[in-house]
From Swiss-Prot:
Keywords: Carbohydrate metabolism, Endoplasmic reticulum, Glycoprotein, Membrane, Signal, Transmembrane, Transmembrane helix. Belongs to the malectin family. Residues 244-264 have a biased composition (Polar residues). This is Malectin. The lineage of its organism: Eukaryota, Metazoa, Chordata, Craniata, Vertebrata. It comes from Mus musculus. GO terms for biological process: protein N-linked glycosylation. Residues 290-291 are cytoplasmic.
């Protein structure tokens, strides 16, 4: 009888130990072995390459480490003209990413080695800090020969001294680069080019590439002016539609007199010619009889 009791006690102890391990398991596991670590790294770890064009190294509020511009002293010119201005839509800590820039009088760009296949996103950061009207600086952006941004006019998009991000998703699989509905052979490097156009020089303020999708990209702060403009455009479209509807109804009313219903008219109008004819026939017959 003692053995069964001992066996029963051992089983209870094992059950208690198992329950304790289940409760403390998440705390005992190290970081990176949990569910989040298994699903994927955080935003800073997802960024495979980042550059503060025309500026020094910087770590933004999301933890992304932007390295110093590798083109310094090699290609184009660096400018910190934007340091004089506050940049809308950007946090105060990260305005430096939009206040410095690199531009060139000819097409220029960056080379980024990519070792692993998968989904990636190229994020380009811009701010117009010099020109105060549109059609003063317009250029294209190419990625491995594909035009991913056409006729970029920063001022026309967001106005002066305002942050603007261009977000370009892409995928690299089986030696092929897919972007903007086009496919090309991928040889291990991404070539990001800022193409000289007819209006001034191409430029960029900062840029980075992350492994992930557009949903992983931090969004800029809302632009009150742009939101108001969009709301006004929507209201104008609604008003125009309402006016068009009212005008259409009005035109339908004024399109002409309604056609009378012949079946609804009074039959007495048909008796008038008969009475006239009868009135003429009686006197004529009387005259003929007297003859």
């Amino acid at each position: 009888m003692l053995r069964p009791r001992g066996a029963e006690g051992t089983a209870v102890a094992l059950l208690r130990l198992l329950l304790l391990l289940l409760l403390l398991g998440p705390k005992l596991r190290g970081p990176g072995l949990g569910v989040v670590g298994a699903a994927g790294a955080g935003l800073p770890e997802s960024v495979i390459w980042a550059v503060n064009a025309g500026g020094e190294a910087h770590v933004d509020v999301h933890g992304i480490h932007f390295r110093k511009d590798p083109l310094e002293g090699r290609v184009g010119r660096a400018s910190d003209y934007g340091m004089k201005l506050p940049i809308l839509r950007s946090t105060p800590e990260d305005q430096i990413l939009y206040q410095t820039e690199r531009y060139n009088e000819e097409t220029f760009g960056y080379e980024v080695p990519v070792k692993e296949e998968g989904d990636y996103v190229l994020v380009l950061k811009f701010a117009e800090v010099y020109f105060a009207q549109s059609q003063q600086k317009v250029f294209d952006v190419r990625l491995n020969g594909h035009v991913v941004v056409k006729d970029l006019d920063i001022f026309d998009r967001v106005g002066h001294s305002t942050a603007h991000d261009e977000i370009i998703p892409m995928s690299i699989r089986k030696g092929k680069l897919s972007v903007r509905g086009e496919v090309s052979t991928f040889t291990g490097k991404l070539y990001i080019e800022f193409v000289k156009g007819y209006y001034d020089n191409p430029k960029v303020c900062a840029l980075y590439i992350l492994a992930g999708t557009v949903d992983d990209v931090p969004k800029l702060q809302p632009h009150p002016g742009l939101e108001k403009k969009e709301e006004e455009e929507e209201e104008e479209e609604y008003d125009e539609g309402s006016n068009l509807k009212r005008q259409t109804n009005k035109n339908r009313v004024q399109s002409g007199p309604r056609t009378p219903n012949p079946y609804a008219s009074d039959n007495s109008s048909l008796m008038f010619p008969i009475l006239v004819a009868f009135g003429v026939f009686i006197p004529t017959l009387f005259c003929l009889c007297r003859l």
